[in-house]
Protein backbone atom coordinates (compact mmCIF):
# COMPACT_ATOMS: atom_id res chain seq x y z
CA UNK A 1 0.00 0.00 0.00
CA UNK A 2 1.14 3.54 -0.61
CA UNK A 3 -0.07 7.12 -0.72
CA UNK A 4 -1.12 6.49 -4.31
CA UNK A 5 -2.99 3.24 -3.62
CA UNK A 6 -6.35 3.86 -5.26
CA UNK A 7 -8.05 1.38 -2.94
CA UNK A 8 -7.39 3.52 0.11
CA UNK A 9 -8.32 7.11 0.91
CA UNK A 10 -5.87 9.67 -0.48
CA UNK A 11 -5.19 13.30 0.40
CA UNK A 12 -7.84 15.87 -0.40
CA UNK A 13 -8.09 19.62 -0.05
CA UNK A 14 -10.74 21.18 2.16
CA UNK A 15 -11.93 24.57 3.35
CA UNK A 16 -10.22 25.95 6.41
CA UNK A 17 -11.75 26.59 9.85
CA UNK A 18 -13.18 29.85 11.03
CA UNK A 19 -11.29 32.19 13.35
CA UNK A 20 -12.28 30.08 16.36
CA UNK A 21 -10.99 26.90 14.75
CA UNK A 22 -14.48 25.44 14.28
CA UNK A 23 -17.00 24.72 11.56
CA UNK A 24 -20.18 26.79 11.35
CA UNK A 25 -21.94 23.86 13.05
CA UNK A 26 -19.69 24.21 16.09
CA UNK A 27 -17.72 21.07 15.28
CA UNK A 28 -13.99 21.21 16.00
CA UNK A 29 -11.87 21.48 12.88
CA UNK A 30 -10.41 18.06 12.13
CA UNK A 31 -8.22 17.54 9.12
CA UNK A 32 -9.30 14.56 7.06
CA UNK A 33 -6.51 13.17 4.93
CA UNK A 34 -8.24 11.01 2.39
CA UNK A 35 -10.79 10.67 -0.35
CA UNK A 36 -14.44 10.26 0.41
CA UNK A 37 -15.21 8.70 -2.96
CA UNK A 38 -13.39 6.77 -5.68
CA UNK A 39 -14.84 5.05 -8.72
CA UNK A 40 -18.36 5.85 -9.89
CA UNK A 41 -20.85 3.85 -7.86
CA UNK A 42 -23.01 1.24 -9.56
CA UNK A 43 -26.80 1.74 -9.49
CA UNK A 44 -27.26 -1.06 -6.96
CA UNK A 45 -24.64 0.55 -4.70
CA UNK A 46 -26.44 3.89 -4.87
CA UNK A 47 -29.65 2.07 -3.98
CA UNK A 48 -28.01 0.39 -0.99
CA UNK A 49 -26.65 3.70 0.27
CA UNK A 50 -30.07 5.32 -0.07
CA UNK A 51 -32.10 2.47 1.40
CA UNK A 52 -29.86 0.62 3.85
CA UNK A 53 -27.55 3.23 5.34
CA UNK A 54 -30.25 5.20 7.20
CA UNK A 55 -31.61 1.96 8.68
CA UNK A 56 -28.15 0.94 9.90
CA UNK A 57 -27.24 4.25 11.51
CA UNK A 58 -25.98 3.95 15.11
CA UNK A 59 -27.80 7.17 15.94
CA UNK A 60 -27.10 10.89 15.83
CA UNK A 61 -23.36 11.19 15.22
CA UNK A 62 -22.98 14.30 13.08
CA UNK A 63 -22.57 17.73 14.61
CA UNK A 64 -25.49 19.08 12.61
CA UNK A 65 -27.89 16.52 14.12
CA UNK A 66 -26.25 16.26 17.56
CA UNK A 67 -24.52 19.56 18.37
CA UNK A 68 -24.68 18.90 22.12
CA UNK A 69 -22.82 15.61 21.56
CA UNK A 70 -25.32 13.55 23.52
CA UNK A 71 -24.13 9.94 23.93
CA UNK A 72 -25.61 7.28 21.67
CA UNK A 73 -28.08 4.88 23.26
CA UNK A 74 -26.28 1.61 22.62
CA UNK A 75 -28.67 -0.21 24.94
CA UNK A 76 -31.53 0.59 22.60
CA UNK A 77 -29.45 -0.26 19.55
CA UNK A 78 -28.11 -3.60 20.76
CA UNK A 79 -30.36 -4.68 23.66
CA UNK A 80 -27.58 -5.00 26.22
CA UNK A 81 -25.20 -7.02 24.06
CA UNK A 82 -21.45 -6.44 24.05
CA UNK A 83 -20.51 -3.90 21.39
CA UNK A 84 -17.43 -3.98 19.14
CA UNK A 85 -16.03 -1.29 16.85
CA UNK A 86 -14.13 -1.64 13.58
CA UNK A 87 -12.29 1.52 12.57
CA UNK A 88 -11.95 1.76 8.78
CA UNK A 89 -13.55 -1.48 7.62
CA UNK A 90 -12.38 -1.26 4.00
CA UNK A 91 -14.56 -3.55 1.91
CA UNK A 92 -16.29 -5.02 4.95
CA UNK A 93 -15.11 -8.63 4.68
CA UNK A 94 -13.90 -8.82 8.26
CA UNK A 95 -16.83 -6.92 9.74
CA UNK A 96 -19.42 -9.17 8.09
CA UNK A 97 -17.45 -12.28 9.09
CA UNK A 98 -17.38 -11.18 12.73
CA UNK A 99 -21.05 -10.21 12.69
CA UNK A 100 -22.10 -13.58 11.30
CA UNK A 101 -19.79 -15.47 13.67
CA UNK A 102 -20.90 -13.49 16.74
CA UNK A 103 -24.66 -12.88 16.50
CA UNK A 104 -24.83 -12.09 20.22
CA UNK A 105 -22.48 -9.11 19.77
CA UNK A 106 -23.30 -5.72 18.27
CA UNK A 107 -20.75 -4.37 15.82
CA UNK A 108 -20.33 -0.77 14.69
CA UNK A 109 -18.22 -0.01 11.64
CA UNK A 110 -16.81 3.45 10.87
CA UNK A 111 -15.57 4.22 7.35
CA UNK A 112 -15.52 7.60 5.55
CA UNK A 113 -14.79 6.15 2.10
CA UNK A 114 -18.19 5.83 0.43
CA UNK A 115 -17.07 3.10 -1.98
CA UNK A 116 -16.05 0.94 0.98
CA UNK A 117 -19.37 1.64 2.69
CA UNK A 118 -21.19 0.59 -0.47
CA UNK A 119 -19.17 -2.64 -0.61
CA UNK A 120 -20.08 -3.43 3.00
CA UNK A 121 -23.76 -2.76 2.37
CA UNK A 122 -23.70 -5.09 -0.62
CA UNK A 123 -22.30 -7.85 1.58
CA UNK A 124 -24.83 -7.15 4.33
CA UNK A 125 -27.69 -7.33 1.83
CA UNK A 126 -26.67 -10.95 1.16
CA UNK A 127 -25.92 -11.73 4.81
CA UNK A 128 -28.12 -12.94 7.64
CA UNK A 129 -26.37 -10.59 10.09
CA UNK A 130 -28.71 -8.19 11.89
CA UNK A 131 -26.26 -6.94 14.50
CA UNK A 132 -24.39 -4.28 12.49
CA UNK A 133 -24.53 -0.49 12.57
CA UNK A 134 -22.61 1.71 10.13
CA UNK A 135 -21.20 5.21 10.50
CA UNK A 136 -20.22 6.48 7.05
CA UNK A 137 -17.80 9.09 8.31
CA UNK A 138 -14.85 9.94 10.51
CA UNK A 139 -14.35 7.58 13.46
CA UNK A 140 -13.44 10.54 15.65
CA UNK A 141 -16.95 11.95 15.31
CA UNK A 142 -18.35 8.56 16.29
CA UNK A 143 -16.06 8.23 19.31
CA UNK A 144 -17.21 11.67 20.47
CA UNK A 145 -20.70 10.29 21.10
CA UNK A 146 -19.99 6.74 22.20
CA UNK A 147 -20.55 6.38 25.94
CA UNK A 148 -17.45 6.01 28.10
CA UNK A 149 -16.38 2.40 28.66
CA UNK A 150 -19.09 1.08 26.35
CA UNK A 151 -17.08 -1.13 23.96
CA UNK A 152 -15.65 -4.59 24.57
CA UNK A 153 -13.42 -4.82 21.50
CA UNK A 154 -11.99 -2.67 18.71
CA UNK A 155 -10.29 -3.48 15.42
CA UNK A 156 -7.85 -1.47 13.31
CA UNK A 157 -7.00 -3.65 10.31
CA UNK A 158 -4.58 -2.64 7.57
CA UNK A 159 -5.07 1.10 8.04
CA UNK A 160 -3.66 3.58 5.57
CA UNK A 161 0.11 3.43 6.28
CA UNK A 162 1.00 7.01 5.31
CA UNK A 163 4.57 5.83 4.62
CA UNK A 164 6.27 9.23 4.27
CA UNK A 165 7.81 10.40 7.55
CA UNK A 166 6.15 13.80 7.36
CA UNK A 167 2.77 12.07 7.17
CA UNK A 168 3.14 9.77 10.19
CA UNK A 169 1.04 12.13 12.29
CA UNK A 170 -1.89 11.26 10.01
CA UNK A 171 -1.85 7.63 11.12
CA UNK A 172 -4.56 6.39 13.45
CA UNK A 173 -1.98 5.29 16.02
CA UNK A 174 -1.46 8.78 17.44
CA UNK A 175 -2.78 10.07 20.74
CA UNK A 176 -5.38 12.19 18.90
CA UNK A 177 -7.14 8.94 18.00
CA UNK A 178 -5.97 6.55 20.70
CA UNK A 179 -7.06 8.60 23.71
CA UNK A 180 -10.70 8.81 22.54
CA UNK A 181 -10.59 5.10 21.72
CA UNK A 182 -9.30 4.31 25.19
CA UNK A 183 -12.12 6.39 26.69
CA UNK A 184 -14.85 4.33 25.02
CA UNK A 185 -13.29 0.91 25.66
CA UNK A 186 -14.08 -0.95 28.86
CA UNK A 187 -11.22 -1.91 31.18
CA UNK A 188 -10.01 -5.27 29.93
CA UNK A 189 -11.32 -4.66 26.40
CA UNK A 190 -9.25 -5.95 23.49
CA UNK A 191 -7.80 -3.79 20.71
CA UNK A 192 -6.52 -5.64 17.64
CA UNK A 193 -4.22 -4.06 15.07
CA UNK A 194 -3.14 -5.73 11.82
CA UNK A 195 -0.60 -4.15 9.49
CA UNK A 196 2.00 -5.17 6.93
CA UNK A 197 4.15 -2.05 7.35
CA UNK A 198 7.15 -2.48 9.73
CA UNK A 199 7.28 1.20 10.64
CA UNK A 200 3.56 1.14 11.43
CA UNK A 201 4.28 -1.74 13.80
CA UNK A 202 6.99 0.35 15.46
CA UNK A 203 4.72 3.37 15.90
CA UNK A 204 1.87 1.19 17.15
CA UNK A 205 4.05 -0.43 19.80
CA UNK A 206 5.32 2.99 20.88
CA UNK A 207 2.03 4.88 20.96
CA UNK A 208 -0.71 2.45 21.96
CA UNK A 209 0.72 1.68 25.45
CA UNK A 210 0.89 5.43 26.14
CA UNK A 211 -2.89 5.55 25.83
CA UNK A 212 -3.42 2.96 28.57
CA UNK A 213 -3.06 -0.36 26.77
CA UNK A 214 -0.90 -3.41 27.43
CA UNK A 215 0.57 -5.39 24.55
CA UNK A 216 -0.43 -9.04 24.99
CA UNK A 217 2.56 -10.86 23.53
CA UNK A 218 4.81 -13.43 25.12
CA UNK A 219 6.71 -14.55 22.04
CA UNK A 220 7.09 -14.01 18.27
CA UNK A 221 4.26 -16.37 17.39
CA UNK A 222 1.85 -14.04 19.16
CA UNK A 223 2.25 -11.42 16.42
CA UNK A 224 3.21 -13.65 13.50
CA UNK A 225 0.12 -15.85 13.51
CA UNK A 226 -3.36 -14.45 12.82
CA UNK A 227 -6.07 -14.63 15.43
CA UNK A 228 -8.09 -17.83 15.57
CA UNK A 229 -11.22 -16.12 14.25
CA UNK A 230 -9.39 -14.20 11.53
CA UNK A 231 -10.52 -13.94 7.92
CA UNK A 232 -7.95 -12.66 5.46
CA UNK A 233 -9.01 -9.40 3.81
CA UNK A 234 -8.31 -8.12 0.32
CA UNK A 235 -5.74 -5.71 1.77
CA UNK A 236 -3.90 -8.59 3.41
CA UNK A 237 -3.97 -10.59 0.18
CA UNK A 238 -2.49 -7.60 -1.64
CA UNK A 239 0.27 -7.35 0.97
CA UNK A 240 1.10 -11.04 0.63
CA UNK A 241 1.19 -10.82 -3.17
CA UNK A 242 3.63 -7.94 -2.89
CA UNK A 243 5.87 -9.81 -0.44
CA UNK A 244 5.05 -7.99 2.79
CA UNK A 245 4.62 -9.76 6.12
CA UNK A 246 1.45 -9.25 8.17
CA UNK A 247 1.73 -8.48 11.87
CA UNK A 248 -1.11 -9.17 14.30
CA UNK A 249 -0.89 -7.07 17.45
CA UNK A 250 -3.22 -7.54 20.42
CA UNK A 251 -3.59 -4.97 23.19
CA UNK A 252 -5.73 -4.87 26.32
CA UNK A 253 -7.22 -1.74 27.83
CA UNK A 254 -5.93 -1.33 31.36
CA UNK A 255 -7.90 0.00 34.34
From Swiss-Prot:
Q: Which reaction does it catalyse?
A: guanosine(46) in tRNA + S-adenosyl-L-methionine = N(7)-methylguanosine(46) in tRNA + S-adenosyl-L-homocysteine
Q: In which pathway does it act?
A: tRNA modification; N(7)-methylguanine-tRNA biosynthesis
Query: Which Gene3D superfamilies did the record assign?
Result: Vaccinia Virus protein VP39
The reply to whether tRNA processing figures as a keyword in the UniProt entry is yes
MF-aspect GO terms: tRNA (guanine(46)-N7)-methyltransferase activity
- Which keywords does this Swiss-Prot/TrEMBL entry list? Methyltransferase, S-adenosyl-L-methionine, Transferase, tRNA processing
**The keyword Electron transport is assigned to this record:** no
Ranges for region Disordered: 1-29
InterPro entries, per the entry? SAM-dependent_MTases_sf (IPR029063), tRNA_(Gua-N-7)_MeTrfase_Trmb (IPR003358), tRNA_methyltr_TrmB_bact (IPR055361)
User: Which Gene Ontology CC terms are recorded?
Assistant: tRNA methyltransferase complex
Q: Which CDD domains match?
A: AdoMet_MTases (cd02440)
EC number(s): the record gives: 2.1.1.33
- SUPFAM superfamilies registered for this protein in UniProt: S-adenosyl-L-methionine-dependent methyltransferases
| Residue sites binding substrate per the record | 164, 196, 233-236
Residues bound to S-adenosyl-L-methionine: 86, 111, 138, 160
Residues in the active site? Answer: 160
Q: What does this protein do?
A: Catalyzes the formation of N(7)-methylguanine at position 46 (m7G46) in tRNA.
Family of the protein in this entry: Belongs to the class I-like SAM-binding methyltransferase superfamily. TrmB family.
This protein is called tRNA (guanine-N(7)-)-methyltransferase
* Source organism of the structure: Ruegeria sp. (strain TM1040)
The organism's taxonomy opens as: Bacteria, Pseudomonadati, Pseudomonadota, Alphaproteobacteria, Rhodobacterales
Amino acid sequence: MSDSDASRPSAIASDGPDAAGKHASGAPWRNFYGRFKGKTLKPNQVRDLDEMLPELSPGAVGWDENPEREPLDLEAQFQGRDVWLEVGFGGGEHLVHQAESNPDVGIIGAEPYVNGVAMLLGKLRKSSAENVRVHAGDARDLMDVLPAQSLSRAFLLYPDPWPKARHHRRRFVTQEHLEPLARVLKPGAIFRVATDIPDYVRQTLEEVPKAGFKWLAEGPEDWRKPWGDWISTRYEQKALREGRTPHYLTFQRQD
